[in-house]
Curated annotation (Swiss-Prot):
Sample GO molecular function, one term: pyrophosphatase activity
NCBIfam families: PRK00714.1-2, PRK00714.1-4, PRK00714.1-5
Residue intervals of the Nudix hydrolase domain: 6-149
Keyword hit for Membrane: no
EC number assigned by the record: 3.6.1.-
Organism: Paraburkholderia phymatum (strain DSM 17167 / CIP 108236 / LMG 21445 / STM815) (Burkholderia phymatum)
Family, as annotated: Belongs to the Nudix hydrolase family. RppH subfamily.
Protein task: Accelerates the degradation of transcripts by removing pyrophosphate from the 5'-end of triphosphorylated RNA, leading to a more labile monophosphorylated state that can stimulate subsequent ribonuclease cleavage.
Protein name: RNA pyrophosphohydrolase
Amino acid sequence: MLDREGFRPNVGIILLNAHNEVFWGKRLREHSWQFPQGGIKYGETPVQAMYRELHEETGLLPEHVKVIGRTRDWLRYEVPDKFIKREVRGHYRGQKQIWFLLRMVGRDCDICLRATDHPEFDAWRWNEYWVPLDCVIEFKRDVYQLALTELSRFLRRPQPRTERPGGHHHGQRYPRMASSVNAPPGASMASSMTVTTVTTAIAVESTLRATIESDCSSTEDPAVQAPGLRD
């Protein structure tokens, strides 16, 4: 479903915890990180689409979150032609998004990346609200910055921590990584590549993924052809 200008209606989600840290998900079998987002289906309102995408991508239900705010208008980004299927070039231009700021009132263990048969993420982490966006695919960065900036007016004073920063396994900082492995938002990158560094990064990522799946066990845009870019 495209508008007259060739943009597909979409919702984006910035999910906060009590410390004003933001949820980031790692794209399935990729080394890029992003916020939950997805298309608005015919007949859906943006709010309905937001709750559906929230559950599909994070496993969270409406009772696990509180809506704090949303962008006043659509924010748009264009998808480069090389990522658009040939048969729709000239018609499809990109996405227009309403962004929602949510605060999580549930527990970290309520997050489950395998709530559906087609998960979007294979790892997740909490990170500071303001971080460099180098890990985000380039054509989405401006929209991320606009959404974060507009919605920052709703931020409140964070709750004091009961544990040291990074004490929770989902929020721990990754070690320095070689340039072939993208770090999570805000994490540092190694200046040179070594076999030990790459091995360590992969081992940490595998451990994080296994831990997430263990915790959760108890509790597509047709115009875009590149993996990880459909939403």
